[in-house]
């Protein structure tokens, strides 16, 4: 109205006609994160199952808030026993995202990630069977596909050959996943992690893990419990302070904790910050 005062009946009618401003969907509210401190070499470790769903297809999704910059820091790595082959995802000393798989990937973004007050969402979706080389590794940051990578002397400019078996997806009872460190010592993570997911056997769409809030335009998390995780898949929401490595995927792929305690459970998450 001209006076700026609306009568109750007018407001009701405007709501019915979808003309009254209302709060947009807020997305899934993440309760907890896990704090990794490089000073105490915090990490999570799990022996992989003997039979993975696939060594050619898989998807990693996680939210991360960095604490320290300009050092090599491993987010996740796979230790392949009795062999020097391995795969890992990291930030390098220049704060680029970097993925290395010794069966055929060396990719580093041109973008840098240096905002220690921000939560970043990374999705790394793999499928080596695809005909288009650059589709075999799809990287998304906050819902947007990243396509600008540093020049590489490796074949395919750092992208894998078709139909390779990714080391980072390889199972076996003597193989191990490490979150927060490389399979050997060093390059420890100094950051908060939330909603850490691995899907064994599928190159998932980024929209399986997040969505843009229709009112704010901000990328927010989605519920992932309805996804199919595969034999070695896992979902770590970090909601059990007494067992921060507990897997909630239904696959019982729990991680053992190394130097992490209940004090490392945090309420600083991608939903609150």
Question: Over which residues does each language-model region extend?
Answer:
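Short surface loop/edge beta-strand patches of beta-sandwich-type extracellular domains
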Residues: 38-58, 105-113, 181-185, 220-227
